[in-house]
């Protein structure tokens, strides 16, 4: 069931969580990334569209990090959650247009999760950007990353504060399904989760669209057969 009020409350609790851990997390980020001009805060994640997220059957995607998130973006109040909602409503622009295939894949995965019986060959031809609006979303790195996820990301991903924040996000969102988008090892390092855990590659990986969709479909079928 979609409960807009509940979804808004979840996002507000997440916003307060990020404020509470902001100083500690930024300190660790600066230590790991050696960022000479870090932002004054961390990013905001959570339920993308409060009017579309089914809280009782919720799906949380966990990705690695954002690239190119400038201090100006932060100072203007441009945060990941609201930016992603805008993208689902108005299409790719800005940061998202740099790697469109990644967002198309995320949309297709969301679509398949919401309707597992659909034809994969047809889905592979659809961009499905709007389907991302049915998800909750977070990143392992809550600030920003480099052009590729290297040792700085790994060091931050392994930090205790990263695991602490991730567990608290999951506790607030209470998803039924978690999809690890190239983050499965980071996830199992920090989290013990009783729901469905789907292991997927990075959505921008050089893997054929249908291969990734079949990987997702097979995992969903495996969960169904075990239920």
Predicted ranges, named:
Residues 2-12, 140-227:
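Glycine/proline-rich loop-helix segments at beta-alpha junctions forming the active-site rim
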Residues 2-173:
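A polyanion-binding, active-site-adjacent surface
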């Amino acid at each position: 069931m979609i409960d807009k009020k509940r979804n808004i409350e979840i996002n507000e609790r997440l916003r307060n969580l990020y404020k509470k851990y902001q100083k500690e997390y930024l300190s660790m980020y600066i230590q790991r990334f050696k960022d000479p001009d870090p932002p004054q805060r961390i990013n905001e994640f959570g339920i993308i569209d409060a009017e579309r997220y089914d809280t009782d059957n919720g799906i949380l995607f966990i990705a690695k990090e954002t690239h190119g998130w400038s201090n100006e973006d932060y100072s203007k109040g441009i945060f990941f959650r609201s930016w992603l909602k805008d993208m689902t409503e108005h299409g790719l622009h800005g940061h998202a247009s740099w790697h469109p295939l990644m967002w198309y894949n995320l949309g297709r995965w969301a679509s398949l999760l919401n309707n597992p019986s659909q034809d994969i060959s047809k889905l592979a031809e659809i961009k499905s950007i709007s389907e991302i609006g049915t998800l909750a979303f977070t990143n392992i790195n809550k600030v920003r990353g480099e052009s590729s996820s290297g040792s700085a990301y790994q060091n931050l991903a392994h930090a205790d504060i990263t695991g602490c924040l991730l567990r608290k996000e999951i506790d607030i969102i209470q998803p039924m399904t978690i999809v690890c988008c190239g983050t499965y090892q980071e996830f199992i390092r920090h989290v013990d989760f009783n729901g469905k855990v789907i292991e997927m590659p990075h959505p921008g990986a050089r893997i054929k669209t249908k291969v990734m969709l079949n990987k997702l479909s097979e995992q969903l079928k495996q969960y169904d057969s075990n239920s």
